């Protein structure tokens, strides 16, 4: 029982741009070990269905689910001038049992 659009309904060029970068942090690593989930920075207008299709297309793994978090950019000061960091949309992609996704080489 599949919900939402099928993998074939998406433009492959768009799917290649949906995933901006993997997020490798202490929190993301803990989540990956505990719940077999991988964290990505994604486009602001990316949908859960697009993210799922992009991960399946690029990494050839089966995705169980996708959770998305929008993080507002912080206001930062540089001397007298005020700047602002970009808003970030994070996707926590949970993989099906038995699936594994290695984003980088293991440090020795």
Swiss-Prot record:
Q: Which cysteines are joined by disulfide bonds?
A: none
Keywords noted in UniProt: Ribonucleoprotein, Ribosomal protein, RNA-binding, rRNA-binding
Transmembrane stretches, by residue range?
Answer: none
Gene Ontology biological process terms, A to Z: translation
Q: Name one GO cellular component term.
A: ribonucleoprotein complex
This protein's source sits in the domain of life called: Bacteria
Which Pfam families does this UniProt record tie to the protein?
Ribosomal_L23
Keyword RNA-binding on entry? yes
| Matching InterPro entries | Nucleotide-bd_a/b_plait_sf (IPR012677), Ribosomal_uL23-like (IPR013025), Ribosomal_uL23/eL15/eS24_sf (IPR012678)
A GO term for molecular function: structural constituent of ribosome
Protein family according to the UniProt entry: Belongs to the universal ribosomal protein uL23 family.
Question: What NCBIfam families has UniProt attached to this entry?
Answer: PRK05738.1-3, PRK05738.2-4
Q: Describe the subunit structure.
A: Part of the 50S ribosomal subunit. Contacts protein L29, and trigger factor when it is bound to the ribosome.
Query: Which PANTHER family does the record cross-reference, listed alphabetically?
Result: 60S RIBOSOMAL PROTEIN L23A
Function description: One of the early assembly proteins it binds 23S rRNA. One of the proteins that surrounds the polypeptide exit tunnel on the outside of the ribosome. Forms the main docking site for trigger factor binding to the ribosome.
In its UniProt entry, what is this protein called? Large ribosomal subunit protein uL23
